[in-house]
Amino acid sequence: MELYNLTAHELKTKIDNKEVKVEEVVQSYLNRIEKVDSKVGAFLYTGSEEAIKKAKELDNKISKGESLKALGGIPVSIKDNISVKGMQNTCASKMLEGYKSPYDAHVIEKIKNEDGIILGKVNMDEFAMGSSTENSAYKKTRNPWDLDRVPGGSSGGSAAAVAAMETPLALGTDTGGSVRQPAAFCGLVGLKPTYGRTSRYGAIAFGSTLDQVGMLSKDVEDCALLTKNIAGLDHRDFTTADIKVPDYTQFLKKDLKGKKIGIPRECFGEGLDESVRKAINEALQVLKENGAEIEEFSLPSLDYALAAYYIISSAEASSNLARFDGIRYGHRTKDYTDAVDIYFKSRDEGFGKEAKRRIMLGTYVLSEGYYDAYYKKALKVRNLIKKEYENVFKRYHAIISPTSPTPAFKIGEKINDILAMYLIDAYTVPVSVAGLPAMSIPCGMVDGLPIGLQIIGNYYKEDDIFNIAYSYEQSTEWHKMKPQL
């Protein structure tokens, strides 16, 4: 079997047992990228030389009898909005074309400290704004299950790279579903941790009260391994929590006896594809058989979550992206007459259509006369959603819903239908608005396309999510399915 077919924990075992060299593992993935990425389009930059150099260093350590750390020799690919020292960090935007990061993000420091190997930077929707990775200024990324379909977004490059077996692990960012939805579309495990569980230091901001670094992997154990080793307090991000990070691999048990799971009626109404509904219902039956108690409940505020999310996230984006003006940061136009002209033309040339749309919306809702009517009201809705979830979690260990109302859609199908594109995130957005942790795991196939099951946990209770996800995974075969490229 080719090394790229293996999971991260299988590779780690082989490396630790000296069955394979780290350089062989890295080379296997570099060869795979060379073979299939012209079809998939996941990578914006491959750090081949750096990766091979690091692999040789680790092999040298092993030859001296030293043990590697928790991520020893495992390649990880990084969404192109997370800073890796010396590598490009473009946010898939012309605004940051040619920019190389002078420092490592906190999560990258942790990967490097645990002997992980950074393989390269992967494609995304510009500034993480989108649900299909069609908003990249550089290339289209395709779904490895069907090259005519989107991989999801905004972390579509991360998901496509793992699904195409170009990398065993990938980091993305999740603001409103940008890790979970691509995981669902590409048949992967994707986790958005609790807001504050992972540091945002070094991740270029979109919506500062929503953004969270997330993980994509082939199975639940790989996700637990990566999460355990990148989560935790960082004094450079004051929103990170000083709460001990457990060893999530200890919660990978099949038995769900005593676990209570709630099913929100609002997530099973109009707009849900019947094939997705069927797959979710079958998954719930599996969890019941494994000992979980399951009951329906109502979460009325979910109907307002999408509107609140787009107001809050766009407001924060308009503020965060104001710095890219051609004067201090970002692309500067070559054709200008004065300073004001530089602002207008640089931003017009540097930002794509969706980024401009959200900046304009955000500026509008923050402007005098509209602040109270929109932004302030959205914050009130956010508090209402949080309170409803807090009450629900007094009764349940977890909540389950579909990750997305449909499987992956065709490239170009929704790009001009903004409402349809935004509705794709209807089930992931409320979780982000509340700051809760959630994971998408594969739970079925329809017409050759994967379907995702979303497991939502209480604040800092990722352990419950891992337990339920692992229980389902061990009772099914969906995580073993691989696309034919």
UniProtKB/Swiss-Prot annotation:
It comes from the Bacteria. Its EC number is 6.3.5.7. It holds the Pfam family Amidase. It is an enzyme of class 6 (ligase). The active site is at 79 (charge relay system), 154 (charge relay system), 178 (acyl-ester intermediate). GO terms for cellular component: glutamyl-tRNA(Gln) amidotransferase complex. It catalyses: L-glutamyl-tRNA(Gln) + L-glutamine + ATP + H2O = L-glutaminyl-tRNA(Gln) + L-glutamate + ADP + phosphate + H(+). Disulfide bonds: none annotated. The keyword Cell division does not apply. InterPro entries: Amidase, Amidase_CS, Amidase_dom, AS_sf, GatA. The keyword Nucleotidyltransferase does not apply. Keywords: ATP-binding, Ligase, Nucleotide-binding, Protein biosynthesis. One of its GO terms (biological process) is translation. GO terms for molecular function: ATP binding; glutaminyl-tRNA synthase (glutamine-hydrolyzing) activity. Belongs to the amidase family. GatA subfamily. Allows the formation of correctly charged Gln-tRNA(Gln) through the transamidation of misacylated Glu-tRNA(Gln) in organisms which lack glutaminyl-tRNA synthetase. The reaction takes place in the presence of glutamine and ATP through an activated gamma-phospho-Glu-tRNA(Gln). Heterotrimer of A, B and C subunits. This is Glutamyl-tRNA(Gln) amidotransferase subunit A.
